[in-house]
A protein has these predicted regions:
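A nucleotide- and high-energy phosphate-metabolite-utilizing enzyme signature
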Residues: 1-159
Length: 159
């Protein structure tokens, strides 16, 4: 009974209407802050791709999915039903919020990255790949990120 109460509260919170533009700016700012903190410049400059934190990586997919849940669950309650990214991506495609092809590409990238990250972790290696790795996935993820958030990007040079 406690689990069902917690789940009901979770869904209620997720389905609260939000200002999409403000949410998008907050998500972008949080992602940039994480990237600066968790992705050392020397790694990027060394020609490596961090599967989790790199541009077009796991965390970018997770942030887009969570943005979609927070932004649109009040209109599409089904988005708040699941907590896993793959089922949420399926819902986004089914409901027409993302193109089906985009959802397939994001899901494939997410599962590919996670599998590689698990293999590296089992070998006690960092979740780093050569810079030329996963180019198709990185392009697809980065393109969707731009499409989703570019309309809400603000020019901070005048602030």
């Amino acid at each position: 009974q406690l689990a069902s109460m917690v789940n009901a509260l979770r869904e209620e919170i997720l389905r609260t209407p939000r200002d999409e533009a403000a949410l998008a700016r907050e998500v972008q700012a949080m992602r940039e802050k994480m990237r600066k903190h968790l992705l050392p410049d020397e790694r990027t400059e060394a020609g490596e791709f961090n599967l989790k934190q790199g541009a077009g990586g796991i965390v970018d997919i997770e942030f887009m999915v969570q943005y979609a849940v927070l932004a649109w669950s009040h209109r599409v309650p089904e988005l708040a039903r699941w907590s896993d990214n793959v089922r949420i991506l399926e819902t986004l495609g089914r409901e027409g919020l993302f193109e089906q092809q985009e959802c397939a590409a994001l899901t494939q990238a997410y599962l590919t990255y996670r599998s590689a990250a698990h293999q590296l972790s089992l070998q006690q290696q960092p979740v780093i790949a050569p810079a030329g790795s996963y180019l198709e996935e990185r392009v697809a993820v980065s393109a969707k990120w731009q499409q989703l958030f570019a309309p809400y990007t603000t020019d901070t040079t005048n602030e």
